[in-house]
Amino acid sequence: MNGVYDVGGTDGLGPINRPADEPVFRAEWEKVAFAMFPATFRAGFMGLDEFRFGIEQMNPAEYLESPYYWHWIRTYIHHGVRTGKIDLEELERRTQYYRENPDAPLPEHEQKPELIEFVNQAVYGGLPASREVDRPPKFKEGDVVRFSTASPKGHARRARYVRGKTGTVVKHHGAYIYPDTAGNGLGECPEHLYTVRFTAQELWGPEGDPNSSVYYDCWEPYIELVDTKAAAA
């Protein structure tokens, strides 16, 4: 999806002033927002790619001006409403209540040991996205490939700065959930995944550092084989 969410390769945004002692969480609510991801995942709100797509539904100005974990809250709300698991009017009513009564106790709820176990597993071990497929990969290490110029309207992992650029396959990872379908509610549809090396001069032109490269993970439909013999003729 094109938008402010795809800022890779963009300049002119100023320096990144990162404090030397920056904490993992800057506020208590951010800890809750972090823990909510595996919990909402388990509850059927969304998958990982849908999680990202929900963030892409934010107003661009709000996205740029808000803290990182607020993006997470926004996608929980988006998918909670979409799936019928959150009633927006009730959410707004409860939010207003706690704004007016910040010291009021939170609603009681039943502890679910299996959910806590799942959250711990997801946080410390991750949620694997690799899948088995019965078709061989189209590309191998050393192949010269070109990244598609397609401009998707839904969720995808096709950064604008690599579209139309030529690179070299350096690794095949097996098959993984395909974000272009999974992120748009169309199923996992796993595709082979590759790491492709793009030189800085291929990406940025003659002014690019001749000793630098970017390694970009590409799903199979993103790339096509370049006929190097024909190109050299």
From Swiss-Prot:
Biotechnology: Industrial production of acrylamide is now being developed using some of these enzymes.
Protein name: Cobalt-containing nitrile hydratase subunit beta
GO molecular function, one term: nitrile hydratase activity
Complex and partners: Heterotetramer of two alpha and two beta chains.
EC number: 4.2.1.84
Top-level EC class: lyase
GO biological process: nitrile catabolic process
Alphabetic keyword roster: Lyase
Catalytic activity reported: an aliphatic primary amide = an aliphatic nitrile + H2O
Gene3D superfamilies referenced in this protein's UniProt entry, alphabetically: 2.30.30.50, Nitrile hydratase, beta subunit
Temperature remarks: Optimum temperature is 60 degrees Celsius.
Organism: Pseudonocardia thermophila
Physiological role: NHase catalyzes the hydration of various nitrile compounds to the corresponding amides.
One Pfam family linked to the record: NHase_beta_N
SUPFAM superfamilies (UniProt xref): Electron transport accessory proteins (SSF50090)
Family membership: Belongs to the nitrile hydratase subunit beta family.
